[in-house]
Protein backbone atom coordinates (compact mmCIF):
# COMPACT_ATOMS: atom_id res chain seq x y z
CA UNK A 1 0.00 0.00 0.00
CA UNK A 2 1.18 3.52 -0.81
CA UNK A 3 -0.47 6.22 1.29
CA UNK A 4 -0.19 9.99 0.97
CA UNK A 5 -1.30 12.02 3.98
CA UNK A 6 -2.06 15.68 3.25
CA UNK A 7 -2.19 18.30 6.02
CA UNK A 8 -3.13 21.89 5.13
CA UNK A 9 -0.63 24.14 6.95
CA UNK A 10 -2.14 26.40 9.70
CA UNK A 11 -5.21 26.27 7.51
CA UNK A 12 -7.67 28.89 8.82
CA UNK A 13 -4.92 31.48 9.29
CA UNK A 14 -3.37 30.65 5.92
CA UNK A 15 -6.70 31.20 4.15
CA UNK A 16 -6.90 34.61 5.81
CA UNK A 17 -3.39 35.37 4.52
CA UNK A 18 -4.40 34.37 0.99
CA UNK A 19 -7.46 36.64 1.11
CA UNK A 20 -5.56 39.42 2.89
CA UNK A 21 -1.96 39.47 1.57
CA UNK A 22 -1.11 42.33 3.95
CA UNK A 23 -1.27 39.79 6.81
CA UNK A 24 1.54 37.66 5.36
CA UNK A 25 4.64 37.61 7.54
CA UNK A 26 2.85 39.18 10.51
CA UNK A 27 1.53 37.39 13.62
CA UNK A 28 -2.06 36.40 12.82
CA UNK A 29 -4.59 34.82 15.17
CA UNK A 30 -7.97 33.40 14.09
CA UNK A 31 -10.44 33.56 16.97
CA UNK A 32 -13.80 32.14 17.98
CA UNK A 33 -15.48 35.02 19.80
CA UNK A 34 -18.16 34.14 22.35
CA UNK A 35 -19.84 37.54 22.07
CA UNK A 36 -19.96 38.24 25.80
CA UNK A 37 -17.20 40.86 25.56
CA UNK A 38 -14.85 42.08 22.83
CA UNK A 39 -12.09 39.77 24.07
CA UNK A 40 -14.05 36.75 25.27
CA UNK A 41 -13.56 33.50 23.39
CA UNK A 42 -10.70 31.25 22.33
CA UNK A 43 -7.98 30.99 19.71
CA UNK A 44 -8.94 28.67 16.82
CA UNK A 45 -5.52 28.71 15.18
CA UNK A 46 -2.52 30.96 14.64
CA UNK A 47 0.11 31.32 11.95
CA UNK A 48 3.72 30.42 12.69
CA UNK A 49 4.71 34.02 13.44
CA UNK A 50 2.10 34.13 16.21
CA UNK A 51 3.06 30.66 17.45
CA UNK A 52 6.64 31.85 17.92
CA UNK A 53 5.27 34.43 20.35
CA UNK A 54 3.56 31.68 22.35
CA UNK A 55 0.02 31.81 20.97
CA UNK A 56 -1.63 28.38 20.86
CA UNK A 57 -4.94 26.95 19.69
CA UNK A 58 -7.49 26.79 22.50
CA UNK A 59 -5.88 29.64 24.42
CA UNK A 60 -8.26 32.34 25.73
CA UNK A 61 -8.18 35.36 23.43
CA UNK A 62 -7.44 37.71 26.30
CA UNK A 63 -4.34 35.68 27.23
CA UNK A 64 -3.17 35.63 23.60
CA UNK A 65 -3.52 39.41 23.48
CA UNK A 66 -1.42 39.73 26.60
CA UNK A 67 1.49 37.73 25.18
CA UNK A 68 1.12 38.97 21.59
CA UNK A 69 -0.46 42.44 21.74
CA UNK A 70 0.87 43.41 18.31
CA UNK A 71 -0.67 40.39 16.54
CA UNK A 72 -3.61 40.71 14.16
CA UNK A 73 -6.81 39.17 15.58
CA UNK A 74 -9.58 38.14 13.18
CA UNK A 75 -12.86 36.22 13.68
CA UNK A 76 -13.17 32.69 12.34
CA UNK A 77 -15.05 32.53 9.00
CA UNK A 78 -15.85 28.85 8.71
CA UNK A 79 -17.92 28.94 5.47
CA UNK A 80 -14.94 30.47 3.66
CA UNK A 81 -12.54 27.84 5.03
CA UNK A 82 -14.99 25.09 4.06
CA UNK A 83 -15.09 26.42 0.50
CA UNK A 84 -11.28 26.25 0.26
CA UNK A 85 -11.31 22.78 1.82
CA UNK A 86 -13.94 21.53 -0.62
CA UNK A 87 -11.92 22.61 -3.63
CA UNK A 88 -8.71 21.08 -2.30
CA UNK A 89 -10.41 17.81 -1.36
CA UNK A 90 -11.86 17.52 -4.85
CA UNK A 91 -8.40 18.09 -6.29
CA UNK A 92 -7.00 15.35 -4.02
CA UNK A 93 -9.79 12.99 -5.04
CA UNK A 94 -8.67 13.16 -8.66
CA UNK A 95 -5.27 11.75 -7.68
CA UNK A 96 -6.48 8.95 -5.38
CA UNK A 97 -7.81 5.41 -5.63
CA UNK A 98 -9.51 6.10 -2.29
CA UNK A 99 -9.76 9.22 -0.14
CA UNK A 100 -10.47 9.33 3.58
CA UNK A 101 -11.29 12.82 4.84
CA UNK A 102 -10.00 13.03 8.42
CA UNK A 103 -10.98 16.66 9.06
CA UNK A 104 -11.51 19.95 7.27
CA UNK A 105 -7.74 20.19 6.68
CA UNK A 106 -6.49 16.58 6.59
CA UNK A 107 -6.95 13.63 4.24
CA UNK A 108 -5.45 10.22 3.54
CA UNK A 109 -5.05 9.09 -0.07
CA UNK A 110 -4.48 5.51 -1.19
CA UNK A 111 -2.59 5.92 -4.47
CA UNK A 112 -1.31 2.35 -4.84
CA UNK A 113 -3.07 1.65 -8.13
CA UNK A 114 -2.66 5.20 -9.41
CA UNK A 115 1.12 4.77 -9.36
CA UNK A 116 1.00 1.06 -10.25
CA UNK A 117 2.58 0.08 -6.95
CA UNK A 118 5.75 2.09 -7.62
CA UNK A 119 6.71 3.89 -4.40
CA UNK A 120 9.02 6.40 -6.11
CA UNK A 121 6.15 7.36 -8.40
CA UNK A 122 4.08 7.89 -5.26
CA UNK A 123 6.65 10.41 -4.04
CA UNK A 124 6.53 12.23 -7.37
CA UNK A 125 2.73 12.30 -7.17
CA UNK A 126 2.97 13.85 -3.70
CA UNK A 127 5.21 16.59 -5.10
CA UNK A 128 2.74 17.17 -7.91
CA UNK A 129 -0.14 17.43 -5.44
CA UNK A 130 1.72 20.01 -3.34
CA UNK A 131 2.49 22.11 -6.40
CA UNK A 132 -1.02 21.88 -7.81
CA UNK A 133 -2.64 23.01 -4.55
CA UNK A 134 -0.19 25.91 -4.29
CA UNK A 135 -0.82 27.02 -7.87
CA UNK A 136 -4.61 26.73 -7.74
CA UNK A 137 -5.40 27.79 -4.16
CA UNK A 138 -2.19 29.54 -2.97
CA UNK A 139 -2.22 27.18 0.02
CA UNK A 140 0.86 25.28 1.22
CA UNK A 141 0.38 21.75 2.50
CA UNK A 142 2.62 19.27 4.26
CA UNK A 143 2.61 15.77 2.83
CA UNK A 144 3.71 12.41 4.18
CA UNK A 145 4.29 9.34 1.99
CA UNK A 146 4.55 5.91 3.59
CA UNK A 147 3.34 2.28 3.35
CA UNK A 148 0.46 2.89 5.81
CA UNK A 149 -1.77 5.64 7.17
CA UNK A 150 -0.17 6.08 10.58
CA UNK A 151 3.38 6.34 9.27
CA UNK A 152 2.27 8.79 6.57
CA UNK A 153 0.73 11.03 9.24
CA UNK A 154 3.71 10.77 11.59
CA UNK A 155 6.25 11.70 8.92
CA UNK A 156 4.03 14.59 7.79
CA UNK A 157 3.85 15.88 11.37
CA UNK A 158 7.65 15.77 11.49
CA UNK A 159 7.92 17.70 8.21
CA UNK A 160 5.77 20.78 8.95
CA UNK A 161 5.35 23.34 7.56
CA UNK A 162 5.26 23.07 3.76
CA UNK A 163 7.24 19.82 3.85
CA UNK A 164 7.36 16.48 2.10
CA UNK A 165 8.21 13.56 4.39
CA UNK A 166 8.92 10.07 3.09
CA UNK A 167 9.29 6.65 4.71
CA UNK A 168 10.17 4.07 2.09
CA UNK A 169 9.26 0.41 2.71
CA UNK A 170 12.94 -0.42 3.32
CA UNK A 171 13.12 2.31 5.99
CA UNK A 172 10.04 1.36 7.99
CA UNK A 173 11.61 -0.96 10.57
CA UNK A 174 14.43 1.42 11.47
CA UNK A 175 11.93 4.28 11.72
CA UNK A 176 9.65 2.27 14.03
CA UNK A 177 12.58 1.26 16.24
CA UNK A 178 13.47 4.91 16.93
CA UNK A 179 9.93 6.26 17.20
CA UNK A 180 9.09 7.91 20.53
CA UNK A 181 5.84 6.73 22.07
CA UNK A 182 4.48 10.29 22.32
CA UNK A 183 4.87 10.79 18.56
CA UNK A 184 2.22 8.19 17.78
CA UNK A 185 -1.23 9.49 16.77
CA UNK A 186 -3.79 8.70 19.44
CA UNK A 187 -1.28 8.72 22.30
CA UNK A 188 -1.88 11.88 24.30
CA UNK A 189 0.46 13.38 26.86
CA UNK A 190 -1.27 11.76 29.85
CA UNK A 191 -1.17 8.25 28.36
CA UNK A 192 2.41 8.80 27.17
CA UNK A 193 3.46 9.60 30.75
CA UNK A 194 1.78 6.45 32.05
CA UNK A 195 3.54 4.37 29.39
CA UNK A 196 6.84 6.05 30.26
CA UNK A 197 6.30 5.01 33.88
CA UNK A 198 5.92 1.43 32.65
CA UNK A 199 9.30 1.76 30.93
CA UNK A 200 7.94 2.40 27.46
CA UNK A 201 9.83 5.33 25.94
CA UNK A 202 10.10 4.07 22.37
CA UNK A 203 7.56 2.14 20.33
CA UNK A 204 9.96 -0.82 20.23
CA UNK A 205 9.71 -1.10 24.04
CA UNK A 206 6.15 -2.41 23.57
CA UNK A 207 7.58 -5.72 22.32
CA UNK A 208 9.44 -6.41 25.58
CA UNK A 209 6.57 -5.59 27.94
CA UNK A 210 3.79 -7.75 29.33
CA UNK A 211 0.84 -7.33 26.99
CA UNK A 212 -1.73 -7.69 29.79
CA UNK A 213 -0.10 -4.83 31.69
CA UNK A 214 -0.16 -2.72 28.55
CA UNK A 215 -3.84 -3.51 28.03
CA UNK A 216 -4.69 -2.41 31.57
CA UNK A 217 -3.18 1.01 30.91
CA UNK A 218 -4.36 1.66 27.36
CA UNK A 219 -7.46 -0.48 26.93
CA UNK A 220 -7.84 -3.38 24.50
CA UNK A 221 -8.19 -1.46 21.24
CA UNK A 222 -5.25 0.85 21.80
CA UNK A 223 -3.02 -1.95 23.11
CA UNK A 224 -3.65 -3.96 19.94
CA UNK A 225 -3.04 -0.86 17.82
CA UNK A 226 0.34 -0.24 19.48
CA UNK A 227 1.36 -3.89 19.26
CA UNK A 228 0.55 -4.12 15.55
CA UNK A 229 2.41 -0.89 14.90
CA UNK A 230 5.46 -2.09 16.85
CA UNK A 231 5.42 -5.41 14.97
CA UNK A 232 5.13 -3.57 11.64
CA UNK A 233 1.81 -5.33 11.05
CA UNK A 234 -0.45 -2.27 11.03
CA UNK A 235 -2.45 -2.29 7.80
CA UNK A 236 -5.72 -0.40 8.31
CA UNK A 237 -6.94 0.52 4.82
CA UNK A 238 -7.78 3.97 3.53
CA UNK A 239 -11.58 4.04 3.21
CA UNK A 240 -13.83 6.24 1.10
CA UNK A 241 -15.37 8.04 4.04
CA UNK A 242 -15.42 11.34 5.84
CA UNK A 243 -15.03 11.81 9.57
CA UNK A 244 -16.46 15.33 9.31
CA UNK A 245 -19.90 15.25 10.97
CA UNK A 246 -22.88 16.81 9.22
CA UNK A 247 -25.61 18.19 11.44
CA UNK A 248 -28.74 20.31 11.42
CA UNK A 249 -30.56 21.88 14.36
CA UNK A 250 -33.99 23.50 14.38
CA UNK A 251 -35.77 25.62 16.98
CA UNK A 252 -39.22 24.36 17.94
CA UNK A 253 -42.20 26.78 17.83
CA UNK A 254 -42.38 26.49 21.63
CA UNK A 255 -40.75 24.44 24.37
CA UNK A 256 -42.41 21.04 24.51
CA UNK A 257 -42.12 17.33 25.24
CA UNK A 258 -44.85 16.40 22.77
CA UNK A 259 -43.33 13.94 20.31
CA UNK A 260 -46.00 14.79 17.72
CA UNK A 261 -44.82 18.41 17.76
CA UNK A 262 -41.11 17.55 17.73
CA UNK A 263 -41.11 14.85 15.03
CA UNK A 264 -41.80 17.07 11.98
CA UNK A 265 -38.86 19.27 12.97
CA UNK A 266 -36.65 16.24 13.58
CA UNK A 267 -37.60 14.86 10.16
CA UNK A 268 -36.79 18.21 8.52
CA UNK A 269 -33.41 18.25 10.29
CA UNK A 270 -32.71 14.73 8.98
CA UNK A 271 -33.62 15.73 5.43
CA UNK A 272 -31.37 18.79 5.51
CA UNK A 273 -28.46 16.88 7.09
CA UNK A 274 -28.68 14.09 4.49
CA UNK A 275 -28.81 16.69 1.71
CA UNK A 276 -25.36 17.88 2.82
CA UNK A 277 -23.70 14.52 2.25
CA UNK A 278 -22.95 12.43 -0.77
CA UNK A 279 -22.91 9.03 0.87
CA UNK A 280 -24.29 7.01 3.74
CA UNK A 281 -23.61 7.76 7.44
CA UNK A 282 -22.61 4.90 9.69
CA UNK A 283 -23.78 6.72 12.81
CA UNK A 284 -26.75 8.95 13.59
CA UNK A 285 -27.15 11.01 16.75
CA UNK A 286 -30.24 12.88 17.93
CA UNK A 287 -29.45 16.00 19.94
CA UNK A 288 -32.00 17.77 22.13
CA UNK A 289 -31.30 21.22 23.53
CA UNK A 290 -33.48 21.55 26.58
CA UNK A 291 -35.35 24.59 27.89
CA UNK A 292 -32.47 25.40 30.27
CA UNK A 293 -29.97 25.02 27.35
CA UNK A 294 -28.63 21.74 28.69
CA UNK A 295 -27.80 19.32 25.87
CA UNK A 296 -28.87 15.67 25.71
CA UNK A 297 -27.81 13.29 22.96
CA UNK A 298 -28.27 9.67 21.98
CA UNK A 299 -26.70 7.94 19.00
CA UNK A 300 -26.64 4.62 17.22
CA UNK A 301 -24.03 3.09 14.94
CA UNK A 302 -24.70 0.85 11.93
CA UNK A 303 -22.04 -1.42 10.46
CA UNK A 304 -23.18 -0.90 6.87
CA UNK A 305 -24.64 2.59 7.21
CA UNK A 306 -28.19 3.87 7.50
CA UNK A 307 -30.39 5.18 4.69
CA UNK A 308 -32.50 8.29 5.10
CA UNK A 309 -35.71 6.22 5.13
CA UNK A 310 -34.46 4.11 8.04
CA UNK A 311 -33.07 7.20 9.76
CA UNK A 312 -36.56 8.58 10.43
CA UNK A 313 -37.59 5.60 12.59
CA UNK A 314 -34.21 5.29 14.30
CA UNK A 315 -34.22 9.00 15.14
CA UNK A 316 -37.74 8.79 16.55
CA UNK A 317 -36.69 5.89 18.78
CA UNK A 318 -33.62 7.83 19.95
CA UNK A 319 -35.78 10.87 20.70
CA UNK A 320 -38.17 8.79 22.79
CA UNK A 321 -35.21 7.33 24.70
CA UNK A 322 -34.00 10.86 25.49
CA UNK A 323 -37.43 11.84 26.78
CA UNK A 324 -37.55 8.72 28.95
CA UNK A 325 -34.12 9.58 30.34
CA UNK A 326 -35.27 13.12 31.16
CA UNK A 327 -38.88 13.00 32.31
CA UNK A 328 -39.18 16.64 33.40
CA UNK A 329 -37.72 19.24 31.04
CA UNK A 330 -39.12 20.47 27.75
CA UNK A 331 -37.17 20.50 24.49
CA UNK A 332 -36.25 23.88 22.99
CA UNK A 333 -34.27 22.82 19.89
CA UNK A 334 -33.92 19.46 18.15
CA UNK A 335 -31.16 18.31 15.86
CA UNK A 336 -29.44 15.40 14.21
CA UNK A 337 -25.77 14.67 13.53
CA UNK A 338 -24.48 12.23 10.89
CA UNK A 339 -20.99 10.75 11.35
CA UNK A 340 -18.52 8.47 9.56
CA UNK A 341 -19.87 9.06 6.08
CA UNK A 342 -19.22 6.31 3.53
CA UNK A 343 -18.43 8.47 0.51
CA UNK A 344 -19.95 7.83 -2.89
CA UNK A 345 -16.64 8.48 -4.63
CA UNK A 346 -18.12 8.43 -8.12
CA UNK A 347 -19.75 11.76 -7.33
CA UNK A 348 -17.49 13.10 -4.63
CA UNK A 349 -17.79 16.71 -5.74
CA UNK A 350 -21.38 16.77 -4.50
CA UNK A 351 -20.21 15.65 -1.07
CA UNK A 352 -17.87 18.59 -0.67
CA UNK A 353 -20.09 21.27 -2.21
CA UNK A 354 -21.48 23.71 0.31
Swiss-Prot record:
Spell out the reaction equation it catalyses: DNA(n) + a 2'-deoxyribonucleoside 5'-triphosphate = DNA(n+1) + diphosphate
Q: Which residues form the active site?
A: 106
User: What cofactors are annotated for this protein?
Assistant: Mg(2+)
Keyword Nucleotidyltransferase: yes or no? yes
Where is it chiefly localized? cytoplasm
- Residue ranges constituting the UmuC domain according to the UniProt record: 3-188
How it assembles, according to the record, is: Monomer.
Query: What is this protein called in UniProt?
Result: DNA polymerase IV
What organism does the record attribute this protein to?
Saccharolobus solfataricus (Sulfolobus solfataricus)
Amino acid sequence: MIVIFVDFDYFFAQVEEVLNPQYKGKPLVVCVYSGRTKTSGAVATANYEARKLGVKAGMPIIKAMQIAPSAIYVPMRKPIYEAFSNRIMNLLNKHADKIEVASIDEAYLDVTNKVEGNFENGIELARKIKQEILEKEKITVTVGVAPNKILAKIIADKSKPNGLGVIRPTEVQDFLNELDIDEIPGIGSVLARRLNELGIQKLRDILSKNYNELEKITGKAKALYLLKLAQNKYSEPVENKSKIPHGRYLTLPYNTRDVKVILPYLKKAINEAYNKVNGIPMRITVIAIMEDLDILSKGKKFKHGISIDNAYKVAEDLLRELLVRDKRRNVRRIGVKLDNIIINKTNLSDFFDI
